[in-house]
From Swiss-Prot:
Its EC number is 3.1.3.3. Pathway: Amino-acid biosynthesis; L-serine biosynthesis; L-serine from 3-phospho-D-glycerate: step 3/3. It comes from Bacillus subtilis (strain 168). Catalyzes the last step of the phosphorylated serine biosynthetic pathway, i.e. dephosphorylation of O-phospho-L-serine to form L-serine. To a lesser extent, is also able to dephosphorylate phosphothreonine, phosphoethanolamine, and histidinol phosphate in vitro. This is Phosphoserine phosphatase. The gene is serB.
């Protein structure tokens, strides 16, 4: 084994915690102003965001690149590298405003100005909340020098770069960083994995992919003939047809696999 490919969100960075705590803080503002139950309001906003996101002409593009509705609640899509990102950049202020406004409306509150305020509050608050898993740096320290390391992440290039800038120690570990929005297709498309192999100048048998998402990280790498490690920290049940080669609950569990 010569190279380890890592996913970013919820593999090295604890993105779920960032989103969860940002929603909690933002919904607390609405509880203070309107007495809304935070959990109920969050559910309403998440549903409103999903519906809106799917209604835009850019939706198929975001699916291809691998950008979810909640990334759109704080991304500015500020790199005009394609027509898709140019459109997203124009749409996103309205999307943010309406997602929160429609969430309020679902609970009987008609206040577009406050919806806009919450949209901006959420985006600013999310930027303050980069979380890294406890074991991330210890594991990367042990791997660096022994293996070539590549970071493969789906998303908007401007946003993924911003996440990395929020944890500046992370990027220097990697020989290459590949972001789906810059490449033009996202995981699980085989082409992005083949691109990574070419970048690293290695064969598929010399790499292993580590990620938390069965339908993107594991499926795509498997299709490309790359060995896969599903990191499943919360003991989720695999309800897909995707079969990872290995399953771990901590990044520390990688070492016995790599030493085989």
């Amino acid at each position: 084994m010569k190279a380890v490919f890592f996913d970013l969100d919820d593999t090295l960075l604890w993105d779920e915690k960032s989103v969860r705590t940002t929603f909690a803080e933002t919904c607390l503002q609405a509880e203070k102003k309107y007495g809304l139950a935070p959990e109920e309001f969050e559910a309403a906003v998440r549903e409103a965001a999903r519906e809106l996101y799917m209604s835009y002409e850019t939706y198929p593009y975001t699916v291809m690149i691998g950008i979810n509705p909640f990334e759109g609640l704080w991304s500015n899509f500020s790199e005009p590298i394609s027509e898709g990102f140019q459109k997203l950049n124009k749409i996103v202020p309205e999307y943010r405003r309406n997602a929160w406004t429609n969430g309020l409306k679902a609970l009987g509150i008609d206040d577009p100005a406050y919806g806009e305020y919450l949209g901006e509050f959420f985006a600013a608050e999310r930027r303050k909340r980069p979380f890294v898993y406890d074991e991330t740096f210890a594991v990367l320290d042990q791997l660096k020098g022994k293996y070539e390391l590549l970071l493969l992440t789906n998303g908007d290039p401007s946003l993924q770069k911003e996440k990395l800038a929020g944890v500046p120690e992370l990027a220097p570990y990697f020989n290459e960083i590949v972001i789906s929005g810059a490449f033009g297709k996202g995981k699980p498309d085989v082409s992005i994995f083949e691109h990574c192999l070419k970048l690293m100048n290695i064969e598929k048998d010399d790499a292993i992919m580590v990620g938390d998402n069965l339908n993107t990280d594991i499926l795509g790498a498997s299709r490309a003939g790359i060995k896969t490690v599903w990191i499943n920290r919360t003991d989720k049940k695999n309800e897909t047809d995707v079969k990872p080669d290995y399953i771990i609950s901590s990044l520390h569990d990688l070492f016995p696999i790599l030493e085989k």
